[in-house]
Amino acid sequence: MPRRLIDISVALKSGIASDPPHMLPQIEYLDHHQTAPAMAEYMGVSVDQLPNGEYAAVEKVQISTHNGTHMDAPYHFFSTMNHALKPGGEPSWRIDEVPLEWCFQPGVKLDFRHFPAGYIVTPGDVEAELKRIGHTLKPLEIVLVNTAAGAKYGQDDFVDSGCGMGKAATMYLLERGVRLTGIDGWSWDAPFSTTKAKIAAGGDASLIWEGHRAGREIGYSHMEKLHNLELLPPDGFEVVAFPVKVHRASAGWTRAVAIIQE
């Protein structure tokens, strides 16, 4: 049966508004001619003796594990997890401990592009969307959340765009066996700017990072800065998203791909 692969990741790129200013990735590109002198010196030859005076193209990067499309480990959210499953919980898994079984499963897309920036998705919203698409969640399905932020990637207001998943909505997914989710916004939660405004207006500090904090109750992982989710059907596809195995890290860069059987 033929299949179609859809890249649902963004490229690591410097010079665009992909993150807050203090978190932007830096990439230095060295071309074939720039690296030739060092190789020629090491080998004891002249640059002219290398084919066309060239050696290798190389990049130097200064990035966080949370730049680009990446997967957060439970350890990113809180130092312990699974308090709802066992007394006292247990140490949170790092990215090199996330079960590979979580990362290659059938996918489900929730379309929340109509919600305004800063809106916090509720369990009722999730139920209504599942009813609309005619889908019943199954354990280990990968739930992808399509927001208005996806179309803003690289624009100045990207970080402040799109809705976010509240703690209750996240728990709704986890209690049904979901262990990996993803979103095309900068964060799984609502933008920090709108959360800050709500707290300043008298809101509760528990709003801070509430979706992430669900991982303290039931350990899970989510992907952030996904892309092209509007190209996916509501269900009937698979997601492959293995994170880079960074030792004891809170996250790992991920090349996420959706597979549609046609």
What does each model-identified segment do?
Residues 1-262:
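Active-/binding-site microenvironments in catalytic and ligand-binding cores
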